[in-house]
Protein backbone atom coordinates (compact mmCIF):
# COMPACT_ATOMS: atom_id res chain seq x y z
CA UNK A 1 0.00 0.00 0.00
CA UNK A 2 2.83 2.38 0.80
CA UNK A 3 4.38 1.60 -2.58
CA UNK A 4 1.14 2.48 -4.31
CA UNK A 5 0.98 5.78 -2.45
CA UNK A 6 4.58 6.52 -3.42
CA UNK A 7 3.82 5.85 -7.06
CA UNK A 8 0.82 8.12 -6.92
CA UNK A 9 2.75 10.96 -5.26
CA UNK A 10 5.88 10.55 -7.36
CA UNK A 11 6.92 13.02 -10.03
CA UNK A 12 7.61 10.37 -12.67
CA UNK A 13 3.95 9.58 -13.37
CA UNK A 14 2.96 13.23 -13.14
CA UNK A 15 5.69 14.04 -15.64
CA UNK A 16 4.91 11.24 -18.07
CA UNK A 17 1.12 11.33 -17.94
CA UNK A 18 -1.07 14.43 -17.89
CA UNK A 19 -3.86 12.31 -16.36
CA UNK A 20 -2.45 9.68 -13.97
CA UNK A 21 -5.89 8.22 -13.51
CA UNK A 22 -6.00 7.07 -17.11
CA UNK A 23 -2.53 5.56 -16.83
CA UNK A 24 -3.05 3.66 -13.56
CA UNK A 25 -6.62 2.54 -14.11
CA UNK A 26 -5.74 -0.81 -15.82
CA UNK A 27 -3.41 -1.73 -12.93
CA UNK A 28 -5.00 -0.38 -9.76
CA UNK A 29 -8.72 -0.17 -10.46
CA UNK A 30 -11.14 2.69 -10.47
CA UNK A 31 -11.00 3.63 -6.77
CA UNK A 32 -7.22 4.10 -6.82
CA UNK A 33 -7.44 5.90 -10.14
CA UNK A 34 -9.89 8.38 -8.65
CA UNK A 35 -7.61 8.83 -5.70
CA UNK A 36 -4.67 9.52 -8.00
CA UNK A 37 -6.57 12.28 -9.73
CA UNK A 38 -7.28 13.91 -6.37
CA UNK A 39 -3.57 13.83 -5.55
CA UNK A 40 -2.41 15.28 -8.85
CA UNK A 41 -0.44 18.45 -8.10
CA UNK A 42 2.45 20.39 -9.62
CA UNK A 43 5.95 19.20 -8.81
CA UNK A 44 6.89 20.30 -5.32
CA UNK A 45 9.28 23.19 -4.93
CA UNK A 46 12.68 22.71 -3.19
CA UNK A 47 11.28 24.24 -0.01
CA UNK A 48 8.62 21.58 0.19
CA UNK A 49 10.86 18.64 -0.74
CA UNK A 50 11.80 17.89 2.87
CA UNK A 51 8.20 17.64 4.02
CA UNK A 52 7.45 15.38 1.07
CA UNK A 53 10.35 13.05 1.91
CA UNK A 54 9.19 12.98 5.51
CA UNK A 55 5.75 11.88 4.49
CA UNK A 56 7.14 9.18 2.23
CA UNK A 57 9.45 7.96 4.99
CA UNK A 58 6.61 7.72 7.47
CA UNK A 59 4.62 5.68 5.00
CA UNK A 60 7.54 3.35 4.30
CA UNK A 61 8.10 2.84 8.02
CA UNK A 62 4.48 2.00 8.58
CA UNK A 63 4.13 -0.17 5.49
CA UNK A 64 2.51 -2.94 7.51
CA UNK A 65 -0.27 -0.64 8.68
CA UNK A 66 -3.26 0.06 6.57
CA UNK A 67 -3.32 3.51 5.06
CA UNK A 68 -6.75 5.10 5.17
CA UNK A 69 -7.51 6.82 1.87
CA UNK A 70 -10.00 9.61 2.45
CA UNK A 71 -11.43 9.84 -1.06
CA UNK A 72 -14.83 11.12 0.05
CA UNK A 73 -13.84 14.16 2.06
CA UNK A 74 -16.19 17.12 2.01
CA UNK A 75 -13.55 19.37 0.45
CA UNK A 76 -12.93 17.16 -2.57
CA UNK A 77 -16.49 15.97 -3.15
CA UNK A 78 -19.08 18.33 -1.70
CA UNK A 79 -22.30 16.76 -0.56
CA UNK A 80 -24.86 17.87 -3.15
CA UNK A 81 -28.34 16.42 -2.90
CA UNK A 82 -30.02 16.70 -6.27
CA UNK A 83 -33.21 15.16 -4.93
CA UNK A 84 -33.52 17.89 -2.29
CA UNK A 85 -32.84 20.60 -4.87
CA UNK A 86 -35.55 19.24 -7.15
CA UNK A 87 -38.01 19.01 -4.26
CA UNK A 88 -37.29 22.57 -3.15
CA UNK A 89 -37.68 23.90 -6.69
CA UNK A 90 -40.97 22.07 -7.20
CA UNK A 91 -42.28 23.29 -3.84
CA UNK A 92 -41.40 26.88 -4.75
CA UNK A 93 -43.27 26.71 -8.06
CA UNK A 94 -46.31 25.06 -6.48
CA UNK A 95 -46.44 27.84 -3.85
CA UNK A 96 -46.19 30.38 -6.65
CA UNK A 97 -49.01 28.65 -8.53
CA UNK A 98 -51.17 28.65 -5.40
CA UNK A 99 -50.64 32.40 -4.97
CA UNK A 100 -51.66 32.99 -8.60
CA UNK A 101 -54.88 31.02 -8.15
CA UNK A 102 -55.75 32.73 -4.86
CA UNK A 103 -55.03 36.19 -6.31
CA UNK A 104 -57.22 35.40 -9.31
CA UNK A 105 -60.25 34.68 -7.12
CA UNK A 106 -59.65 36.72 -4.00
CA UNK A 107 -57.77 39.67 -5.49
CA UNK A 108 -54.08 40.63 -5.73
CA UNK A 109 -52.27 41.46 -2.49
CA UNK A 110 -55.28 40.45 -0.41
CA UNK A 111 -57.55 43.17 -1.78
CA UNK A 112 -61.16 42.30 -2.60
CA UNK A 113 -61.66 41.24 -6.19
CA UNK A 114 -64.47 43.77 -6.61
CA UNK A 115 -62.11 46.58 -5.64
CA UNK A 116 -59.53 45.40 -8.15
CA UNK A 117 -62.07 45.21 -10.98
CA UNK A 118 -63.36 48.71 -10.27
CA UNK A 119 -60.02 50.44 -9.76
CA UNK A 120 -59.40 53.47 -11.95
CA UNK A 121 -55.58 53.61 -11.82
CA UNK A 122 -52.74 51.14 -11.34
CA UNK A 123 -48.96 51.45 -11.07
CA UNK A 124 -47.40 48.66 -13.12
CA UNK A 125 -43.70 49.55 -12.79
CA UNK A 126 -41.97 51.78 -10.29
CA UNK A 127 -38.32 52.17 -9.39
CA UNK A 128 -37.41 52.04 -5.71
CA UNK A 129 -34.53 49.58 -5.67
CA UNK A 130 -32.21 47.35 -7.65
CA UNK A 131 -34.81 44.59 -7.84
CA UNK A 132 -36.97 46.97 -9.89
CA UNK A 133 -34.13 47.53 -12.36
CA UNK A 134 -33.76 43.77 -12.79
CA UNK A 135 -37.18 43.76 -14.49
CA UNK A 136 -35.70 45.72 -17.40
CA UNK A 137 -33.00 45.32 -20.02
CA UNK A 138 -31.20 47.87 -22.20
CA UNK A 139 -29.86 47.50 -25.73
CA UNK A 140 -28.37 49.64 -28.48
CA UNK A 141 -26.97 49.44 -31.99
CA UNK A 142 -23.76 48.19 -30.44
CA UNK A 143 -25.16 44.69 -30.94
CA UNK A 144 -24.86 45.18 -34.72
CA UNK A 145 -21.55 47.02 -34.66
CA UNK A 146 -22.75 50.56 -33.90
CA UNK A 147 -21.21 53.05 -31.49
CA UNK A 148 -24.20 54.02 -29.32
CA UNK A 149 -24.04 53.27 -25.61
CA UNK A 150 -26.84 53.04 -23.08
CA UNK A 151 -26.88 52.43 -19.31
CA UNK A 152 -29.51 52.06 -16.62
CA UNK A 153 -29.09 52.84 -12.93
CA UNK A 154 -31.02 54.10 -9.94
CA UNK A 155 -31.61 57.83 -9.77
CA UNK A 156 -31.12 60.20 -6.87
CA UNK A 157 -32.24 58.86 -3.47
CA UNK A 158 -33.30 55.58 -5.14
CA UNK A 159 -36.64 57.07 -6.16
CA UNK A 160 -36.39 56.74 -9.95
CA UNK A 161 -34.61 54.98 -12.80
CA UNK A 162 -32.07 56.91 -14.86
CA UNK A 163 -31.56 55.83 -18.47
CA UNK A 164 -28.57 57.57 -20.00
CA UNK A 165 -25.87 57.14 -22.61
CA UNK A 166 -24.58 58.44 -25.93
CA UNK A 167 -26.32 58.18 -29.28
CA UNK A 168 -24.26 57.78 -32.45
CA UNK A 169 -25.76 57.52 -35.94
CA UNK A 170 -22.50 56.34 -37.51
CA UNK A 171 -23.23 53.19 -39.49
CA UNK A 172 -21.16 50.05 -38.81
CA UNK A 173 -18.29 49.46 -41.22
CA UNK A 174 -19.46 45.98 -42.20
CA UNK A 175 -20.28 46.63 -45.84
CA UNK A 176 -23.98 45.87 -45.31
CA UNK A 177 -25.54 48.28 -42.80
CA UNK A 178 -26.39 51.75 -44.04
CA UNK A 179 -28.22 53.14 -41.00
CA UNK A 180 -27.65 53.03 -37.27
CA UNK A 181 -28.23 54.99 -34.11
CA UNK A 182 -30.71 53.70 -31.55
CA UNK A 183 -30.90 52.98 -27.83
CA UNK A 184 -33.73 51.20 -26.06
CA UNK A 185 -35.01 50.15 -22.65
CA UNK A 186 -37.35 47.13 -22.63
CA UNK A 187 -39.24 45.44 -19.81
CA UNK A 188 -38.62 41.75 -19.28
CA UNK A 189 -41.47 39.33 -19.90
CA UNK A 190 -42.92 38.34 -16.50
CA UNK A 191 -42.82 34.69 -15.54
CA UNK A 192 -45.27 32.73 -13.45
CA UNK A 193 -45.10 29.33 -11.81
CA UNK A 194 -43.05 26.74 -13.70
CA UNK A 195 -41.55 29.55 -15.84
CA UNK A 196 -44.79 30.22 -17.72
CA UNK A 197 -45.09 33.48 -19.61
CA UNK A 198 -47.52 35.84 -17.89
CA UNK A 199 -49.21 38.70 -19.73
CA UNK A 200 -50.69 41.95 -18.41
CA UNK A 201 -54.42 42.57 -18.65
CA UNK A 202 -55.15 46.28 -19.11
CA UNK A 203 -58.56 45.84 -20.71
CA UNK A 204 -60.29 47.92 -18.01
CA UNK A 205 -58.03 50.93 -18.64
CA UNK A 206 -57.77 53.24 -21.63
CA UNK A 207 -54.68 55.39 -21.03
CA UNK A 208 -50.98 54.89 -20.37
CA UNK A 209 -49.69 57.10 -17.56
CA UNK A 210 -46.01 57.98 -16.98
CA UNK A 211 -44.07 60.39 -14.80
CA UNK A 212 -40.78 61.21 -16.50
CA UNK A 213 -38.09 63.84 -16.77
CA UNK A 214 -36.01 64.13 -19.95
CA UNK A 215 -33.70 66.37 -21.93
CA UNK A 216 -36.12 67.44 -24.65
CA UNK A 217 -35.63 64.46 -26.97
CA UNK A 218 -38.56 62.56 -28.51
CA UNK A 219 -38.96 58.91 -27.54
CA UNK A 220 -40.94 56.08 -29.06
CA UNK A 221 -43.11 54.09 -26.65
CA UNK A 222 -43.51 50.49 -27.87
CA UNK A 223 -45.96 47.93 -26.51
CA UNK A 224 -45.72 44.28 -27.51
CA UNK A 225 -48.49 41.73 -27.64
CA UNK A 226 -48.10 38.35 -25.97
CA UNK A 227 -47.97 35.76 -28.73
CA UNK A 228 -46.64 32.25 -29.31
CA UNK A 229 -46.19 32.71 -33.05
CA UNK A 230 -42.66 33.36 -34.23
CA UNK A 231 -43.92 35.45 -37.16
CA UNK A 232 -45.36 38.02 -34.75
CA UNK A 233 -42.30 38.58 -32.60
CA UNK A 234 -41.40 41.76 -34.53
CA UNK A 235 -44.89 43.24 -34.36
CA UNK A 236 -45.57 46.07 -31.92
CA UNK A 237 -47.79 49.06 -31.22
CA UNK A 238 -46.09 52.43 -30.93
CA UNK A 239 -46.63 56.09 -30.19
CA UNK A 240 -44.44 59.12 -29.51
CA UNK A 241 -43.52 60.66 -26.18
CA UNK A 242 -42.07 64.18 -26.18
CA UNK A 243 -40.03 65.30 -23.18
CA UNK A 244 -39.80 69.00 -22.29
CA UNK A 245 -36.33 69.13 -20.79
CA UNK A 246 -35.38 71.07 -17.72
CA UNK A 247 -35.40 70.14 -14.04
CA UNK A 248 -39.13 69.57 -13.65
CA UNK A 249 -41.07 66.33 -13.84
CA UNK A 250 -43.83 65.90 -16.40
CA UNK A 251 -46.83 63.62 -16.44
CA UNK A 252 -47.40 61.93 -19.79
CA UNK A 253 -50.80 60.49 -20.69
CA UNK A 254 -51.12 58.51 -23.92
CA UNK A 255 -54.50 56.95 -24.81
CA UNK A 256 -54.21 53.36 -25.98
CA UNK A 257 -56.34 54.25 -29.01
CA UNK A 258 -53.41 56.33 -30.36
CA UNK A 259 -50.98 53.43 -30.65
CA UNK A 260 -50.40 52.40 -34.27
CA UNK A 261 -49.45 48.96 -35.53
CA UNK A 262 -46.02 48.29 -37.06
CA UNK A 263 -44.02 45.28 -38.16
CA UNK A 264 -40.22 45.21 -38.41
CA UNK A 265 -40.10 48.96 -37.88
CA UNK A 266 -42.53 49.81 -40.69
CA UNK A 267 -46.01 51.23 -40.15
CA UNK A 268 -48.54 48.90 -41.78
CA UNK A 269 -51.38 50.03 -44.02
CA UNK A 270 -53.74 47.68 -42.21
CA UNK A 271 -54.08 48.92 -38.64
CA UNK A 272 -55.26 46.96 -35.60
CA UNK A 273 -56.33 48.01 -32.15
CA UNK A 274 -53.95 47.27 -29.32
CA UNK A 275 -55.06 44.02 -27.60
CA UNK A 276 -55.10 45.24 -24.01
CA UNK A 277 -55.87 41.85 -22.49
CA UNK A 278 -52.53 40.26 -23.45
CA UNK A 279 -49.71 42.77 -23.08
CA UNK A 280 -46.24 41.23 -23.01
CA UNK A 281 -43.82 44.13 -22.50
CA UNK A 282 -43.28 47.84 -22.93
CA UNK A 283 -40.21 49.66 -24.18
CA UNK A 284 -38.74 53.10 -24.88
CA UNK A 285 -36.62 53.73 -27.97
CA UNK A 286 -34.49 56.75 -28.88
CA UNK A 287 -33.59 57.10 -32.57
CA UNK A 288 -33.85 60.81 -33.45
CA UNK A 289 -30.50 60.90 -35.35
CA UNK A 290 -29.12 63.60 -33.05
CA UNK A 291 -25.70 62.43 -31.94
CA UNK A 292 -24.64 63.13 -28.40
CA UNK A 293 -25.48 62.36 -24.77
CA UNK A 294 -29.05 61.79 -23.60
CA UNK A 295 -30.96 60.88 -20.47
CA UNK A 296 -34.45 59.88 -19.44
CA UNK A 297 -35.50 59.61 -15.80
CA UNK A 298 -38.60 57.57 -14.99
CA UNK A 299 -40.51 57.67 -11.72
CA UNK A 300 -43.26 55.16 -12.49
CA UNK A 301 -45.25 53.66 -15.36
CA UNK A 302 -48.92 52.97 -14.88
CA UNK A 303 -52.34 52.79 -16.50
CA UNK A 304 -55.61 54.51 -15.65
CA UNK A 305 -59.12 55.09 -16.92
CA UNK A 306 -59.83 58.54 -18.32
CA UNK A 307 -63.62 59.05 -18.42
CA UNK A 308 -63.22 62.01 -20.77
CA UNK A 309 -61.59 59.86 -23.44
CA UNK A 310 -64.19 57.99 -25.47
CA UNK A 311 -62.24 57.29 -28.66
CA UNK A 312 -61.92 53.60 -29.47
CA UNK A 313 -59.43 53.75 -32.35
CA UNK A 314 -57.73 56.76 -33.90
CA UNK A 315 -56.90 55.32 -37.32
CA UNK A 316 -59.20 54.72 -40.23
CA UNK A 317 -59.69 51.39 -41.91
CA UNK A 318 -61.40 50.75 -45.23
CA UNK A 319 -62.74 47.61 -46.96
CA UNK A 320 -59.83 47.76 -49.40
CA UNK A 321 -57.21 47.81 -46.65
CA UNK A 322 -58.82 45.52 -44.10
CA UNK A 323 -61.79 43.63 -45.57
CA UNK A 324 -62.09 41.35 -42.54
CA UNK A 325 -63.46 44.23 -40.46
CA UNK A 326 -66.27 44.89 -42.92
CA UNK A 327 -67.64 41.41 -43.47
Swiss-Prot record:
Coiled-coil positions: none
Phosphoserine carried by residues: 318
Keywords of this entry: Chaperone, Mitochondrion, Phosphoprotein, Transit peptide
GO cellular component: mitochondrial matrix; mitochondrion
Superkingdom of origin: Eukaryota
Biased composition, class Basic and acidic residues, residue ranges: 53-63
Protein name per UniProt: Complex I intermediate-associated protein 30, mitochondrial
Keyword ATP-binding included in the entry's annotation: no
Residue range covered by the transit peptide: 1-24
Localization terms from the record: Mitochondrion; Mitochondrion matrix
Function as written in the Swiss-Prot or TrEMBL entry: As part of the MCIA complex, involved in the assembly of the mitochondrial complex I.
Oligomeric form and interacting partners: Part of the mitochondrial complex I assembly/MCIA complex that comprises at least the core subunits TMEM126B, NDUFAF1, ECSIT and ACAD9 and complement subunits such as COA1 and TMEM186. Interacts with ECSIT. Interacts with ACAD9. At early stages of complex I assembly, it is found in intermediate subcomplexes that contain different subunits including NDUFB6, NDUFA6, NDUFA9, NDUFS3, NDUFS7, ND1, ND2 and ND3. Interacts with TMEM70 and TMEM242.
Similarity section: Belongs to the CIA30 family.
Region (Disordered): 42-63
One record GO biological process: mitochondrial respiratory chain complex I assembly
Predominant subcellular localization, coarse grouping: mitochondrion
Single Gene Ontology MF annotation: unfolded protein binding
Amino acid sequence: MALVHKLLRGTYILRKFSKPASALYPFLGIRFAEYSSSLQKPVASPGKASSQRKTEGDLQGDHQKEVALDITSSEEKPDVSFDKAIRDEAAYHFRHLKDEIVDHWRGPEGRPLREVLLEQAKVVWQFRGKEDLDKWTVTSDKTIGGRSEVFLKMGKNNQSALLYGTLSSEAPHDGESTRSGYCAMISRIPRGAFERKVSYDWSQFNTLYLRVRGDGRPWMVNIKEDTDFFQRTNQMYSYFMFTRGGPYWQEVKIPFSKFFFSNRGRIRDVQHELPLDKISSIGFTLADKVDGPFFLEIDFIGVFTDPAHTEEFAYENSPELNPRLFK
